[in-house]
Amino acid sequence: MTQTAEKPFGKLRSFLWPIHMHELKKVLPMFLMFFCISFNYTILRDTKDTLIVTAPGSGAEAIPFIKLWLVVPSAVVFMLIYAKLSNILNKQALFFAVLSPFVVFFALFPVVIYPCRHILHPTAFADTLQSILPSGFMGFIAMLRNWTFAVFYVLSELWGSVMLSLMFWGFANEITKISEAKRFYALFGVGANVALLISGPAIIWSSKLRASLGEGVDPWGVSLYFLMAMFLCSCAIIAACYWWMNRYVLTDPRFYNPAELKAKKSKPKMSMGESFSYLLRSPYMLLLALLVICYGICINLVEVTWKSQLKMQFPNPNDYSAFMGNFSFWTGVVSVFVMLFIGGNVIRRFGWLTGALVTPIMVLVTGAVFFALVIFRDHATGLVAALGTTPLMLAVVVGAIQNILSKSTKYALFDATKEMAYIPLDQEQKVKGKAAIDVVAARFGKSGGSLIQQGLLVVCGSIGAMTPFLAVALFAIIMVWLTSATKLNKLFLAASAAKEQELAEAAAAEKEASSAAKESAPAIEGVS
């Protein structure tokens, strides 16, 4: 049965489950792949933070150094290797070749690398550097001191960009028809949030195993063993789903027609220089890129300070990891709620600008409250006493709420308005602009915040000392964000109006041509 011959869905089913029965053969393995990749992403994200922040002689100040000096170069090296392998291997072999290094490293980490950390880590050399260099270089020294943990952090960061953005979405975009994508992709988004709801409790469970362990057993080492075992099981499911898709789905003409899918335009590959040039020539794209950059920097500025507070409250890695598991779970709960009941309604009722401004305003308000609690904690004794907690714990909880609300509004509103901004553009602008923003904005958003924090760390010496300056930087960047969104809204409305007028004129011309054809038909019949 073809897609066009099938009955349309009812209103409720089109909202909850817009999938035909025969399409389950294609949807379920893709959904399971996306779920497992997202599950692993959460496991690795929470574990990498726990390793680095709670490591001996380390803390949250190491994160900006790792992101700028290790993650960014590693991403570039990976892309060079990937480009080379893509010319040598077929697509199926390439997928397994990319997955293999993650499987090997994360399999070895809990059984070989972590138990041998005392041998592998240059503790004496790091101590010597710490006695020579200023305190502002502590993050850099911590990166060297715990280099195996830094490698874990880098590969965890690469998992999201490589397996999620590149491998899964590249595979999905290649084999999915446009008519299917409109129905399938929203379900994949639900799968990502369901993964948060399951991975959070899994992290909590593995982090609390120490209660049943005997004396002399490293509880965090045991937790790592189970966390990485879960990761490897998910990788096995990912590999099995990918193999099954290639064996049974891509050989079914109902689901995959290479000739038909070749008509879909591919995104051009643009160098960094070409991306800069394209963005600078287009005010519309430059403003859109600024939105992405500002979000990345703002989240980075708040997260590192929050994680430094989190370490002070939970210095034990198991306690830290358990808290991060709870954080991931509630991020999933709030994200699902916001996506289902708030996101679309805000844009439909109040328009693009309101939807675009919700995320920066949320980051501004919650970030201001968080930084105020960190900076003026000694003056908040009345509030702390009324809540029956400590100033530190209050800052940790408010920071968690800030992160959860910022990320949930980002998923539901920021991403939606960003994608909507491409709609009124012509095909060339859509394709080239998106490619330029993926290259420039994504990298600047991730590394920009790290660069600001490194500069402040070197000057101020510690995260605590630089916190007031981070608050000022956050406020300044959000002002740029709000201004860019407001200016982009004017261009968006103008472009949308022009697009609608163009479509209306095209429809009128088509109607006029159709009427003329009907009028000429009787005359032709009379002549005949």
From Swiss-Prot:
Pfam families assigned to the protein according to its UniProt record, in alphabetical order: TLC (PF03219)
Major location category of this protein: membrane
Gene giving rise to this polypeptide: tlcA
Membrane topology category: Multi-pass membrane protein
GO molecular function terms listed in the Swiss-Prot or TrEMBL record: ATP binding; ATP:ADP antiporter activity
Record-given protein name: ADP,ATP carrier protein 1
UniProt similarity note: Belongs to the ADP/ATP translocase tlc family.
Family matches, as PANTHER family: ADP,ATP CARRIER PROTEIN 1 (PTHR31187:SF1), PTHR31187
Organism: Chlamydia trachomatis serovar D (strain ATCC VR-885 / DSM 19411 / UW-3/Cx)
NCBIfam families noted in UniProt: AAA (TIGR00769)
Keywords, comma-separated and alphabetical: ATP-binding, Cell membrane, Membrane, Nucleotide-binding, Transmembrane, Transmembrane helix, Transport
Residue stretches spanning the membrane: 24-44, 63-83, 93-113, 124-144, 149-169, 184-204, 220-240, 284-304, 327-347, 356-376, 381-401, 463-483
The UniProt record lists the keyword Ribosomal protein: no
GO CC term, one of those recorded: plasma membrane
Subcellular location: Cell membrane
Disulfide partners: none
Region forming the signal peptide: none
